[in-house]
C-alpha cells in the first residue's frame, strides 16, 4: 500500500513518521519508555532526512563518510542500533556521488544479530533506474527488513515536479491512527499526507508515462543515460580528473569527479564551476558530507535531454576552462577566486532580495 506525495521529501516524512509511531506503539505495549527515538543514517543523506528527524523529535545517529567511502558502512550502521532505534535509512543513489548503499548487507546483518529494526529505502533517484538497468540488485521488498520505500516521479520517473511516492510492505507497517478516512468528497477515501490541497496533473503525468513508455521504454531511456554517463566519465578521466561515482549501472547516471591533487593545480573545483557557468553550464561544485568535507568535487546529473553531442560540448568547455585557469599565475588566481566569491555572495543576496521583494509585492497586490 502507498500514497502519492509532492515529492520524496514528503514521502520521507511520512515513512519516518510511520516508523516512529510503530516503534512507540510497540514500546508502550511492552511498558517501556517511548520518549527517546533515534534513527540511523549516513551523514550524506539529503537534508529532508535531517528535517524529518528534527521536526518529529528523533535523535540522529550517523555513520560518517570517510575519505574513500561515501556511503553508509553496514557494520557501523547496525552497531548503532539500540532499543530506541525506529529504523535505518538506506539510500539508493546518494546526492553526493549517486552511489547505491548496500541494503542487502544491512538486512542480512540485522537478521544475523537478531535485531528487530526496520529499513526504509530512500530510492528518490534510484527507484526508477535500478529496476531497468540493474534488475538483479536486491534492495527492495525482497529483503525481509525493508518495510517502506520512497521514490521521486520528477527525477528519473520522467515527470515534471512535483510528485513522489511512498509504499509500505504491508498495511501493518502503516499505523492506522495516521490514516484519516473521509466521505465528504463523493466517496469514502483514506488520506495520509502532510500537504493539503494539490493538483492531480503530476499523478496523471506519471500514469501517462507508465502507459506510453512501459518497461521497455524506461529500460531503453535509463540504459542510454547510463551509457552517456559512462562516456562522460571516460572523457573526464582522460582529462586527468578522478572519478568518484560508480559506472556501468552500479550507480545513478551521475558523474561525480574532482581534480587530482597530485597534479598540483593552483585552482580548485569552484573555479572550474564558475568558468563553466560563464559558458552556460550549471555544474555544481561542493564539499563532501561531514567528516570528509575537505574533499571538493563536482557533479553532472545526466538527464534524458543530455545527448552525446551535448556531452561532447561540455567536455570541450571543461577543456577550455582548464586552459584558461591553467594560464593564470598564483596571484592572478587568488584575485580571480576572490572575485568568484564576491560574485557568488552578490548573486545569493540578490536572489534572496528578489524573493523577499516578490513576496512583498504579492502581499501588496
What are these regions (language model features)?
Residues 120, 128-253, 257-263:
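Active-site C-terminal subdomain of aminotransferase-like
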Residues 17, 213-365:
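Non-catalytic terminal extensions of PLP-dependent enzymes
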Residues 6-9, 32-108, 135-138, 144:
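PLP-dependent aminotransferase-class I/II
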Amino acid at each position: 500500500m502507498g500514497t502519492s506525495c509532492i515529492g520524496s521529501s514528503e514521502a520521507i516524512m511520512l515513512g519516518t513518521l510511520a516508523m516512529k509511531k510503530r516503534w512507540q506503539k510497540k514500546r508502550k505495549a511492552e511498558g517501556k519508555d517511548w520518549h527517546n527515538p533515534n534513527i540511523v543514517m549516513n551523514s550524506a543523506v539529503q537534508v529532508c532526512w535531517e528535517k524529518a528527524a528534527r521536526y518529529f523529535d528523533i535523535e540522529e545517529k550517523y555513520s560518517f563518510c570517510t575519505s574513500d567511502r561515501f556511503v553508509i558502512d553496514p557494520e557501523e550502521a547496525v552497531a548503532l542500533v539500540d532499543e530506541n532505534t525506529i529504523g535505518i535509512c538506506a539510500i539508493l543513489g546518494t546526492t553526493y556521488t549517486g552511489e547505491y548503499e548496500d541494503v542487502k548487507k544491512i538486512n542480512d546483518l540485522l537478521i544475523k544479530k537478531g535485531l528487530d529494526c526496520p529499513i526504509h529505502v530512500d530510492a528518490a533517484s534510484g527507484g526508477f533506474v535500478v529496476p531497468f538497468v540493474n534488475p538483479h540488485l536486491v534492495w527492495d521488498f525482497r529483503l525481509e527488513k525493508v518495510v517502506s520505500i520512497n521514490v521521486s516521479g520528477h527525477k528519473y520517473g520522467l515527470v515534471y515536479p512535483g510528485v513522489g511516492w511512498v509504499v509500505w510492505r504491508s498495511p501493518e507497517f502503516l499505523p492506522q491512527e495516521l490514516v484519516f478516512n473521509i466521505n465528504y468528497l463523493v466517496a469514502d477515501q483514506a488520506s495520509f499526507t502532510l500537504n493539503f490541497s494539490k493538483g492531480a496533473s503530476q499523478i496523471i503525468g506519471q500514469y501517462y508515462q507508465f502507459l506510453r513508455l512501459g518497461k521497455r521504454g524506461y529500460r531503453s531511456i535509463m540504459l542510454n543515460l547510463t551509457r552517456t554517463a559512462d562516456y562522460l566519465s571516460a572523457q573526464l578521466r582522460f582529462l586527468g580528473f578522478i572519478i568518484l561515482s560508480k559506472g556501468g549501472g552500479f550507480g545513478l547516471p551521475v558523474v561525480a569527479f574532482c581534480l587530482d591533487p597530485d597534479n598540483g593545480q593552483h585552482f580548485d573545483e569552484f573555479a572550474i564551476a564558475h568558468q563553466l557557468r560563464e559558458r552556460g553550464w550549471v555544474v555544481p561544485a561542493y564539499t563532501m558530507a561531514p567528516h570528509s568535507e575537505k574533499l571538493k568535487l563536482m557533479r553532472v546529473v545526466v538527464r534524458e535531454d543530455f545527448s552525446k553531442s551535448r556531452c561532447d560540448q561540455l567536455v570541450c568547455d571543461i577543456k577550455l576552462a582548464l586552459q584558461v585557469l591553467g594560464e593564470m599565475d598564483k596571484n592572478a588566481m587568488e584575485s580571480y577566486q576572490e572575485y568568484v566569491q564576491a560574485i557568488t555572495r552578490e548573486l545569493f543576496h540578490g536572489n534572496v532580495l528578489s524573493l523577499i521583494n516578490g513576496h512583498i509585492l504579492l502581499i501588496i497586490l
